[in-house]
From Swiss-Prot:
Residues covered by region (Involved in binding TNC and actin): 97-118
Domain of life, source organism: Eukaryota
Subunit structure: Binds to actin and tropomyosin.
One Pfam entry name: Troponin
Organism: Homo sapiens (Human)
UniProt keyword annotation of Acetylation present: yes
GO CC entries: cytosol; troponin complex
Gene that produces this protein: TNNI1
Spans traversing the lipid bilayer: none
Expression by tissue: Highest levels observed in human skeletal muscle (e.g. gastrocnemious muscle), differentiated cultures of primary human muscle cells and rhabdomyosarcoma cells cultured in low serum medium. Expressed in C2 muscle cell myoblasts and myotubes.
Protein name as catalogued: Troponin I, slow skeletal muscle
Modified residues annotated as Phosphoserine in this record: 58
InterPro entries found in the cross-reference section: Troponin, Troponin_I, Troponin_sf
PANTHER family on file: TROPONIN I, TROPONIN I, SLOW SKELETAL MUSCLE
């Protein structure tokens, strides 16, 4: 069956209109967030920084005020420097640890596992340690079985081969072979 082309549920012009509306809404939200951030920044600074009353202060009072402000700025700068140093140290340490992890991943590839034959003695040595000397000869408990000599039971007749060939030739030879094949089953 040939596939029928489906018409899109929404036309291209409608899609473009919706996209432009979404972009306009996103821009409006972004501008609103930006204004809120600026307002929050102004509010925070107003809370943290007290207004200075410099009117009516003498020269020595202004100099004392400047010294206090400079001392506060130095303390804040020292704290900022310490925090930056700690951050830099931590980022370097993280980077070094990441490199070590990458190195270790590259070095140790897991080999494909193979079956290994382990004797009972080797397994006990691995489990108990090398100090304990335990031998487990499992073959010692097995019964010994002698192989039966099948060749001794059947005596092989060795004769003149020419007589065998002459005896087996012709119809009588075939009859002898047929009778010989019958005789072991009948016994």
């Amino acid at each position: 069956m040939p596939e029928v082309e489906r018409k899109p549920k929404i036309t291209a012009s409608r899609k473009l209109l919706l996209k432009s509306l979404m972009l306009a809404k996103a821009k409006e939200c972004w501008e609103q967030e930006h204004e809120e951030r600026e307002a929050e920044k102004v509010r925070y600074l107003a809370e943290r920084i007290p207004t200075l009353q410099t009117r009516g202060l003498s020269l020595s009072a202004l100099q004392d005020l400047c010294r206090e402000l400079h001392a506060k700025v130095e303390v804040v700068d020292e704290e900022r420097y310490d925090i930056e140093a700690k951050c830099l140290h931590n980022t370097r340490e993280i980077k070094d640890l990441k490199l070590k992890v990458m190195d270790l991943r590259g070095k140790f590839k897991r080999p494909p596992l193979r079956r290994v034959r382990v004797s009972a003695d080797a397994m006990l040595r691995a489990l108990l340690g090398s100090k304990h000397k335990v031998s487990m000869d499992l073959r010692a408990n097995l019964k010994s079985v002698k192989k039966e000599d099948t060749e001794k039971e059947r005596p092989v007749e060795v004769g003149d081969w020419r007589k065998n060939v002459e005896a087996m030739s012709g119809m009588e030879g075939r009859k002898k072979m047929f009778d010989a094949a019958k005789s072991p089953t009948s016994q």
